[in-house]
């Protein structure tokens, strides 16, 4: 199979990896309440943290990131750099819209980082540094994610990584869409801050 013919396969590989709901799996194994019935109902690490189980939240964050990295590396090995990028897109879509959960998944921050690690790891370091700085300054996890994701494709483009910049610009648009409720709460002044007691 040639590199171009492999691209649809890479998309499927990425989607299947991305659709693994680590947050839901880990919380069920730990015997906690169904993740979809608490907090935001989201299956990501932030909502897992609302169970009070920091270890589970860390495991979810790691699992969600690594599934993006794994999809990219495996597809890149089998089909080359274009396949790696397509797999990254597939992993992101799988995380956001997993078929097993009626297309209701996470918001994409951890898998965004994982895809960056697989495709261009310095970009992942940049994303994390921006996230940390923004979270420290404003104490909003959602703001930190939005700022880091908007700046990442700009920096990739500025350093000549135009194909990666285009991919991550698309992922950023999807990530912003998934944070639309957070944006509404920010506008209303009701978004919860990091460390705030609910």
Swiss-Prot record:
Metabolic or biological pathway: Lipid metabolism; phospholipid metabolism
Signal peptide: none
Protein localization: Cell inner membrane
Keyword DNA-binding: no
EC numbers, comma separated: 2.3.1.275
Protein topology in the membrane: Multi-pass membrane protein
One Gene Ontology term, aspect cellular component: plasma membrane
InterPro entries assigned: G3P_acylTferase_PlsY
Keyword Cell membrane belongs to the record: yes
One Pfam assignment: G3P_acyltransf
GO terms classed as biological process: phospholipid biosynthetic process
Subunit structure: Probably interacts with PlsX.
Function of the protein: Catalyzes the transfer of an acyl group from acyl-phosphate (acyl-PO(4)) to glycerol-3-phosphate (G3P) to form lysophosphatidic acid (LPA). This enzyme utilizes acyl-phosphate as fatty acyl donor, but not acyl-CoA or acyl-ACP.
Classification via PANTHER family: GLYCEROL-3-PHOSPHATE ACYLTRANSFERASE-RELATED (PTHR30309:SF0), INNER MEMBRANE PROTEIN YGIH (PTHR30309)
Protein name as it appears in the record: Glycerol-3-phosphate acyltransferase
Source species: Bradyrhizobium sp. (strain BTAi1 / ATCC BAA-1182)
Lineage: Bacteria, Pseudomonadati, Pseudomonadota, Alphaproteobacteria, Hyphomicrobiales
